[in-house]
């Protein structure tokens, strides 16, 4: 500065004025200053010296104040004044912008790196020496303040999002009970099984429809093998027979007597039989039992009440068995005949004892053989009789009938039959609860329809080698002089004609009662007059037991009957109960597990829709488990209609009610209350399995059974992978026990409703109290959703304010500076040399064009 100005200390020239104005503008360049700090008039482009002089005169007081302000500040390295503050602000802004430009540039490089090519040059740029500023110099700027707020807000936002994700995940896991569960489990000991029969257009079975028998299973949930239908063959058989002959036993009794039949050595070894014989009306037999005699009625046994059948051979689940051919009387040939000759090997009391009291031979090593034999019979008219055209009394339809004089008992329907192969029968002890003389065989024979005869089936008995001595029992074998035995040849030779007859009666033992059916007048209705023939039509799955015969050499003191041949066919004492049991052994009685299987598809629904879907499946399973399979509405058909389910709990109730109306289920008041309870207390109610899982295995509502993957069946006793209890450290038995406790609580509410009031007022009040106590649990997701939404909205607003406002302010400020052409000028460095004040003032004075006199 000029020496004259320093000495005077009052006048400031254009050169000094320009620096002072720069200082003023620089001091205003901070975050607290105005958006437009102003311009330096001495730096306006095109300004003249005259104009600068005028500015000096006009701004002299302001310039004097600025000079005094500068003189008050010590310009040292440790205190750079407001110029140092300005440089800090400028450098901080440039640092932020540099980071932004670096991020944008690197992002652009990642997007277009393929277009840039593989050649890259790394350039080392020396980092400039930066000034260091302490916290006191930095102070609390707007950038620092908003940066801290941004950090806190962002951390809070991520924390809230993490909490929300955890809540959603935990809620989803609670609804997934078991992703790979057993489809069925064995029934337990205390359970009652309801069963029914099903045969299309069969009067005996239709009459039986609706009747139920209570059966108990002796098994535990931990057992891998549960009871089979064969365990209840006796009950099933007795019920079927009694049901089929119910009207017969109510009809007119022809004859009744009691008799005791003893063996050759008295009643030793339980060889006595107490017989009470009832002869019912033959008309009943024609209507109800005729076709059953030939074993041609296909009957399926069905389980109700939520029980199912697992076929251990085909690995299939079903509600009913395959069609079964169940004959009501003894047959030489029958399905899976199981008679054993050696009494010592028989453990099951239901298996008939085929031993004989006076034989040395015994049969063992029996093998089942299918029937590969045919019997052909023909009849030639031999008895007198008349042909008339009449309407049958037992069937409304015109047909030919032969009406001889039955009262004279002179009529005997005789036939000649032959076999297609040699059949050697084993020894016997007795016939159909009575003695049949000679060698014998019984079989069914089918007559085709012709011009004079309609189609019919007959029961034919062939006998040969009948002895004359009635005191001796005709016995298969060749050994002579056996006490009480008449040896006969029991081989039926192929293509040899034997004299046979239509069976005119039979006896049937039901429990301890032996019933005799007189078929004399029933045979009349077959239209047997004239010449006709028939052919045996044994089912392909029927057969006989072919056994080896061995002579017992342990006791030679008494002469006994020896083996007639090396092999023999077991024929006597075919037990229909044993045959039925063996047909039913492959069906294991199982039940549906006590939980709800949620398919993976449902788990992908939105939370509200997912809860509604589970509600619907729970309600359907609850009602269907009470209704059972006998109503015609299977769980498969009902659940599959609603697996794309519904929105709210109320809508779920309406849809379930509609489904029940469609399937004609009687929805009484109590059942409706159970349905509503099932929806409201699913948190404490047992989870029910539905046939929804079957659909996942490829079933639909039109299928009555479906395949079960073997690996699922084998793993039904496995340890649960993940449950809502104990993170999977629980066995199936423990799972079942826990669900049983919940089930008891659920049924406790139902029993309270049933015992206190038909309308269930008290039970519903308790249920409403329970709902009031725990109702807020169901609203937690809704509350969390609203709270989370509000927090997220506020957080995003704060975040946008923190991030955008400072950047926007700086952007506007920089843009205005660029437009106005303003550039920040840093304070010039002060030299350490001492400046002569007089010379500096004089220089400045001459620059302003003043003389020394004017200066004085």
Curated annotation (Swiss-Prot):
This is Envelope glycoprotein gp150. The record marks 611-612 as: Cleavage. The chain crosses the membrane at residues 786-806. Residues 662-680 are annotated as: Immunosuppression. The surface protein (SU) attaches the virus to the host cell by binding to its receptor. This interaction triggers the refolding of the transmembrane protein (TM) and is thought to activate its fusogenic potential by unmasking its fusion peptide. Fusion occurs at the host cell plasma membrane. One of its GO terms (cellular component) is virion membrane. GO terms for molecular function: structural molecule activity. GO terms for biological process: symbiont entry into host cell; virion attachment to host cell. Residues 807-856 are cytoplasmic. Residues 1-785 are extracellular. It comes from Feline immunodeficiency virus (strain UT-113) (FIV). The lineage of its organism: Viruses, Riboviria, Pararnavirae, Artverviricota, Revtraviricetes. Keywords: Cleavage on pair of basic residues, Coiled coil, Disulfide bond, Glycoprotein, Host cell membrane, Host membrane, Host-virus interaction, Membrane, Transmembrane, Transmembrane helix, Viral attachment to host cell, Viral envelope protein, Virion, Virus entry into host cell. The mature envelope protein (Env) consists of a trimer of SU-TM heterodimers attached by noncovalent interactions or by a labile interchain disulfide bond.
């Amino acid at each position: 500065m000029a020496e004259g100005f320093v000495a005077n200390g009052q006048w400031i020239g254009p050169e000094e004025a320009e620096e002072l104005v720069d200082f003023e503008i620089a001091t205003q360049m901070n975050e607290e200053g105005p958006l437009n700090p102003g311009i330096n008039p001495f730096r306006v482009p095109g300004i003249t010296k005259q104009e600068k002089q005028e500015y000096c005169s006009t701004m002299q007081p302001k310039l004097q104040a600025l000079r005094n302000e500068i003189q008050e500040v010590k310009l040292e390295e440790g205190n750079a004044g407001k110029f140092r503050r300005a440089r800090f602000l400028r450098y901080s802004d440039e640092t932020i912008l540099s980071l932004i430009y670096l991020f944008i540039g690197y992002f652009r490089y990642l997007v277009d790196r393929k277009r840039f090519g593989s050649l890259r040059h790394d350039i080392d740029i020396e980092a400039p020496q930066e000034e260091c500023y302490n916290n006191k110099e930095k102070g609390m700027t707007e950038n620092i303040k908003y940066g801290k707020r941004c950090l806190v807000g962002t951390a809070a936002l991520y924390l809230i999002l993490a909490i929300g994700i955890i809540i959603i995940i935990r809620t989803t896991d609670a609804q997934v009970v078991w992703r790979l569960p057993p489809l069925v489990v064995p029934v337990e000991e205390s359970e009652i099984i309801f069963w029914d029969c099903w045969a299309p257009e069969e009067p005996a079975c239709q009459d039986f429809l609706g009747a139920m028998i209570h059966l108990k299973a002796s098994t535990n949930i931990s057992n891998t093998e549960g009871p089979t239908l064969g365990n209840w063959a006796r009950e099933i058989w007795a019920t079927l027979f009694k049901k089929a002959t119910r009207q017969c036993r109510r009809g007119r009794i022809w004859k009744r007597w009691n008799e005791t039949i003893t063996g050759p050595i008295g009643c030793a070894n339980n060889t006595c039989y107490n017989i009470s014989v009832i002869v019912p009306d033959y008309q009943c037999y024609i209507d109800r039992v005729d076709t059953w005699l030939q074993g041609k009625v296909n009957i399926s046994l069905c389980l109700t009440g939520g029980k199912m059948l697992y076929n251990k051979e085909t690995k299939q689940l079903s509600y009913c068995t395959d069609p079964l051919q169940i004959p009501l009387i003894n047959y030489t040939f029958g399905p899976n005949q199981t008679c054993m000759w050696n009494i010592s090997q028989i453990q099951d009391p239901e298996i008939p004892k085929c031993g004989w009291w006076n034989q040395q031979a015994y049969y063992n090593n029996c093998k089942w053989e299918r029937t590969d034999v045919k019997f052909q019979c023909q009849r030639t008219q031999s008895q007198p009789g008349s042909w008339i055209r009449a309407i049958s009394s037992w069937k409304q339809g015109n047909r030919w009938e032969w009406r001889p004089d039955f009262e004279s008992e002179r009529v005997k329907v005789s036939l000649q039959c032959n076999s297609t192969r040699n059949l050697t029968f084993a020894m016997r002890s007795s016939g159909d609860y009575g003695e049949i003389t000679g060698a014998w065989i019984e079989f069914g024979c089918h007559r085709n329809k012709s011009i004079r005869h309609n189609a019919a089936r007959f029961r034919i008995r062939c006998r040969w080698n009948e002895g004359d001595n009635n005191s001796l029992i005709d016995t298969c074998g060749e050994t002579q002089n056996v006490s009480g035995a008449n040896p006969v040849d029991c081989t039926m030779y192929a293509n040899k004609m034997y004299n046979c007859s239509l069976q005119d009666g039979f006896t049937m033992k039901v429990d301890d009662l032996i019933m005799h059916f007189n078929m004399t007048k029933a045979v009349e209705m077959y239209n047997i007059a004239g010449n006709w023939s028939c052919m045996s039509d044994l089912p392909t799955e029927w057969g006989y037991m072919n056994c080896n015969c061995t002579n017992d050499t342990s006791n030679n003191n008494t002469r006994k009957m020896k083996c007639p041949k090396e092999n023999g066919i077991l024929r006597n004492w075919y037990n229909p109960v044993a045959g039925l049991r063996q047909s039913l052994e492959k069906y294991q009685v199982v039940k549906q597990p006590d939980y709800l299987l949620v398919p993976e598809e449902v788990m992908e629904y939105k939370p509200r829709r997912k809860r509604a879907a589970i509600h619907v499946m729970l309600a359907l399973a609850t009602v269907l488990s009470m209704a059972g399979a006998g109503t015609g509405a299977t769980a498969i058909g009902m659940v599959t209609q609603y697996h794309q389910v519904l929105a709210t709990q109320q809508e779920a109730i309406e849809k379930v009610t509609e489904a029940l109306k469609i399937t004609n289920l009687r929805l009484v008041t109590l059942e409706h209350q159970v349905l509503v309870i099932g929806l409201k207390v699913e948190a404490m109610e047992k989870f029910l399995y539905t046939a929804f899982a079957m659909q996942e295995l490829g079933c639909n509502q039109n299928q009555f059974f479906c395949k079960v993957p073997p690996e699922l069946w084998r793993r039904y006793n496995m340890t649960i992978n993940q449950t809502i209890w104990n993170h999977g450290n629980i066995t199936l038995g423990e799972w079942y026990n826990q669900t049983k406790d919940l089930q008891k609580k659920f049924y406790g509410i139902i029993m309270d409703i049933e015992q206190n009031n038909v309308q269930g007022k008290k039970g519903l009040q308790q249920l409403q109290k329970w709902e009031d106590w725990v109702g807020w649990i169901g609203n937690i997701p809704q509350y969390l959703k609203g709270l989370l939404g509000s927090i997220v909205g506020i957080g995003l607003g704060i975040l946008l304010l923190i991030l955008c406002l400072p950047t926007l302010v700086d952007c506007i400020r920089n843009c205005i500076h660029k437009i106005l052409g303003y550039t920040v000028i840093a304070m010039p460095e002060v030299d350490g040399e001492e400046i002569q004040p007089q010379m500096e003032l004089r220089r400045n004075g001459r620059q302003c064009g003043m003389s020394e006199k004017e200066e004085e």
